[in-house]
A protein has these predicted regions:
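Asp-based, Mg2+/Mn2+-dependent phosphohydrolase catalytic module
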Residues: 1-82
């Protein structure tokens, strides 16, 4: 369960991924905390709620923030790295 990073470590071990080869996309702070604990880049999914405090935290702490699924899709296919 988030924010425990076990799931990310398990994926890295089983699929031989390095932290920088992964991206956690989540809409809440526990997902952010989980990604940080595993040293995995994090992106904020801001389309899932309209709570100003959550959006402010995400925008203030996350390098990648997406307001729509379309924005995230465009990022995924842009070839840019997190």
């Amino acid at each position: 369960r988030k924010p425990q990073p076990y799931a990310l470590f398990d994926i890295m071990e089983k699929l031989h991924f390095a932290p920088g080869e992964m991206l956690v996309l989540d809409d809440l702070k526990p997902g952010y905390d989980m990604a940080r604990a595993a040293n995995v880049p994090f992106a904020a999914a801001l389309w899932s709620n309209d709570i100003p405090e959550i959006e402010a935290f995400m925008r203030g702490n996350c390098g990648l923030c997406f307001k729509t699924v379309a924005q995230f899709r465009d990022y995924l296919f842009s070839g840019k790295e997190a």
